[in-house]
């Protein structure tokens, strides 16, 4: 605020001693007035001494205090005017700051800050978990009610009472006193020469049993002397002998396949071997008797002449000598040599 405005405010403010008094009536008492000459005061003093004394007291004591009060009131009025301006400025600032704070608050409500900690996600997860547990509880209660109403189909196995069992020494093996009966050859064993289910190394038939062996288990007539067949044998038997042979060997598992894939039966055709089986030790006598004695001489002569590849010459000489000496009818009936 400039100095001119302060002067105008001071001039506009006028303090009077009384509202009804005339402004020009007592102005002469505030200071020395130029209207009255200096000699007039002396004449008045002569008239009355009491009035002079009162005028002196007012001029010396009361008028300076009133003048100070007037100046203080003018200063107070100016300060109050300044304070009013400051208050108005603060009101404007308060409105602006409040508007700014309100906008920031609205933005903080509408925007989800990622770094601000909040429990919304955790509370949602807890509510979902409680709902899932409630559904699981209802399902378990329904299952329990269903099992309580329905008859129990589960049989509890009795646990063996091991406390009452006493330790018993193992008994010595019993010596078998049964008479050994020669095994009966079944239909499946008759064609053992061309059967690939046999082992490559076949042991001779054991006529007796050792004393420590357990007694033989009784078997039914259908399962006696029967061996397990591979997939290749099943295909070969089904393709060559027809569905009757498969039903006889495999049981009722191939009835559906035999019914859907009928193959005509060829009774005159013999089963062919998928591989060369082993030769029994007891059957080597036929090979020795059928060979001519001159086979060994041919082998030695061939070795002396060539001197190389004795194994190939030996096999060729043996095969030639055996094929030349043994007739075709006997060669078909016996088993081929082990390779």
UniProtKB/Swiss-Prot annotation:
InterPro entries: DASH_Dam1. Residues 1-13 have a biased composition (Basic and acidic residues). It is found in: Nucleus; Cytoplasm, Cytoskeleton, Spindle; Chromosome, Centromere, Kinetochore. Residues 307-332 have a biased composition (Polar residues). Residues 18-34 have a biased composition (Low complexity). GO terms for biological process: attachment of spindle microtubules to kinetochore; cell division; centromere clustering; mitotic sister chromatid biorientation; positive regulation of attachment of spindle microtubules to kinetochore; positive regulation of microtubule polymerization; protein localization to chromosome, centromeric region; protein transport along microtubule to mitotic spindle pole body. GO terms for molecular function: identical protein binding; microtubule plus-end binding. Keywords: Cell cycle, Cell division, Centromere, Chromosome, Chromosome partition, Coiled coil, Cytoplasm, Cytoskeleton, Kinetochore, Microtubule, Mitosis, Nucleus. Residues 120-150 form a coiled coil. Its main location: nucleus. GO terms for cellular component: cytoplasm; DASH complex; mitotic spindle polar microtubule; mitotic spindle pole body. Component of the DASH complex consisting of ASK1, DAD1, DAD2, DAD3, DAD4, DAM1, DUO1, HSK3, SPC19 and SPC34, with a stoichiometry of one copy of each subunit per complex. Multiple DASH complexes oligomerize to form a ring that encircles spindle microtubules and organizes the rod-like NDC80 complexes of the outer kinetochore. DASH complex oligomerization strengthens microtubule attachments. Within the complex, DAM1 and DUO1 may form the microtubule connections. On cytoplasmic microtubules, DASH complexes appear to form patches instead of rings. Component of the DASH complex that connects microtubules with kinetochores and couples microtubule depolymerisation to chromosome movement; it is involved in retrieving kinetochores to the spindle poles before their re-orientation on the spindle in early mitosis and allows microtubule depolymerization to pull chromosomes apart and resist detachment during anaphase. Belongs to the DASH complex DAM1 family. This is DASH complex subunit DAM1. The gene is DAM1.
